[in-house]
Amino acid sequence: MNRREFLTNAALTGAATMLLSRAAMAQGAPEITEISFGFGLDPVFAPHIVAMQKGWLEEAGFTSVTTTSFTGGALAGEALIAGEIQLWTPGNLPPISMVHTGIPVVVLGTNCIAAAADNLVARADANINAPEELYEARIGLLAGSTASVSLSQLAKHYGLDEARLQVVNMPPPEQLAALNAGEIEAFLCWQPWGHNALSGGATLVHSGTASGFEQNRGEAVRISATRSLFVASQEFVRQNPNATRALMATLVRGQGYVSDPANRSEVLALVAQETGQEPAVVEAIWDQYVFDPTFDDGYVADMQTMTDYLESSGRISDGMDPLSYTYTDPAAEAGVTVEVAGGWQP
């Protein structure tokens, strides 16, 4: 489903989800009333923010909702398994890696498609105008993140030898500082870091969905398979079926609300307020996120791209079918279109 099709149906979906969420809650009160989310600074958390600000989570039976920020996906994943948070909303690579190492997590849904938000940016004086000129650049990225996959896909598409690329492992804030200091020539990261670099005079070499190279500037080239997912521990889902349904119904309601163009100004203001980002920054990057919860072939393809990367890089063996650790029932009950059903059951 493309963005236009999804937004055309957003109002109907939101209304249906409101009714379904009430029906789901009628099945039984959540087993827990206190819940904590892993949180971050980018707009992917818009559904969570709206659900909290409008009191929908409290309406669903969660009387205490807290958020905890983490510097990396691994730390958030550990907190999820330890029960310190109940919902994790990472990019799709970390949970796939965790599943393949035996850590019991389950995907409950797609929060948003964020391929366009992955940006490879470079210093203007690096003069990177062609793919092969990347060999001369030190490229900052967070190793093991979705950015690693995007760089690998870029190399594959343009026929580059990935082993020759000079990757410097560093977290996003350090990437921007290092770029400004001339310690690296480029970095590949998600928002708002790419936007901040471009605002400071950097150039866009490639986004997750389009080329910035001279040879094919503006051409649609999808190097990113990044999705933001709703992830929970298997133990939480098994022990809290009502809470799981209520949580997903509320988040899906939030997705429908933030996707409705009529709510854009309100949502952007809430996101800026809660994340501490400048409103102009949120406005500039907002359209790079598509809050489409549909379970379709696109979901499977993006998850498989990540799995294939992990397998080809030797980080996992015997890649699993993404649907084997995907639980679609709560999302389906909340009104999400499920074209490919998950195979995991509590």
Language model: regions and residue ranges:
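Solvent-exposed, polar/charged alpha-helical surfaces in well-ordered, non-transmembrane soluble domains
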Residues: 55, 78, 82, 96, ...
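Secondary-structure end/capping motifs
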Residues: 237-317
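Conserved C-terminal helix/tail region of periplasmic/extracytoplasmic solute-binding proteins
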Residues: 308-346
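N-terminal export signals
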Residues: 5-26
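Sec/Tat-exported extracytoplasmic proteins
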Residues: 61, 84, 89, 99, ...
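Pocket-lining segment of extracytoplasmic ligand-binding domains
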Residues: 93, 176, 185-271
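Short, solvent-exposed loop/beta-turn-alpha elements that line the ligand-binding surface or hinge
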Residues: 59-63, 210-223, 291-298
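Short, glycine-/small- and polar/acidic-enriched structural segments
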Residues: 27-174, 185-191, 204-208
